[in-house]
């Protein structure tokens, strides 16, 4: 269930213990899922769905923060402002949905020191944990896995995260079970 770095997946083992025959195929995409082309029943998106076949079954605002390893910050110092970050620090980021985070989009566009970008959240997280630079991640990663939330930069970008289902299949029992599991995760406290 790690279909997005914004969604914690701590409860997956209990889900499959209860529903061992349900298979989840995760497809990562920049654009909102095209349910007809991908032949999928539900998906996550940072945009409200368009079209009458899709419905929002859950949504959540996800808060992000600027993060780096303590080792990177010890060696390079913590930026005092967005301008300091842009001018003096290595930036590691994800292209794709980060354009929904306006302050991060501006940093990625203006920084002469973007040293790493990827379409994979997990690659960005791995590079940040290796001391690659400073990035923006959902707050659930703060003080976890070797990353520390920067305290000098006060901006906390936020984006709405939607769980979207196909209107005609959302009430099929095995799909409803997955929807309910994701909804429970989305409504839990994780930022």
What is the role of each PLM region?
Residues 5-6, 75, 144, 172:
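Loop/helix-junction capping segments adjacent to catalytic residues or to phosphate/diphosphate-binding pockets
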Residues 37, 49-132, 137-161, 188-191:
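C-terminal regulatory
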Residues 1-52:
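Central regulatory/effector-binding core of bacterial HTH transcription factors
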Residues 1-3, 72, 169:
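Short histidine/acidic/glycine/proline-rich micro-motifs that form metal-
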Residues 153-191:
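A late-sequence structural motif
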